[in-house]
Amino acid sequence: METECMQDVFINTLIESWRFAKTYAKILEKLDLRERHKYAGRLTWYMKKLSENAAKAGFKIKEYEAGEPFDTGMAVTTVNMDEFAPEEALVIEQMLEPIIMNREGQILQTGTVLLRRA
């Protein structure tokens, strides 16, 4: 039972760290070019370390980029699917939470996405 609890804590920490990094990236966009360049390397380093540490603990963070075609077979929950007709072609507008998998590829936590029309 304690192992499951620790796994849940680690998964939640991964998700919140990923969210923090995405927010940091949005803040970087507001900086002038010189300042942005100065801090962008830190974000790259942070994301690399997050992925490395997740892998060491047996986890993988999976995300989809904005503009990727949406498929109902993706391991994600949609927050606005009810806004579209079933036959509409959709793409991911924003990834709100990443997918967390174990090293065997089993989904431990589904991601969350916001969709838009293609």
Regions found by a protein language model. Name each.
Residues 1-37, 45-118:
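Extended, amphipathic alpha-helical stalk segments that mediate dimerization
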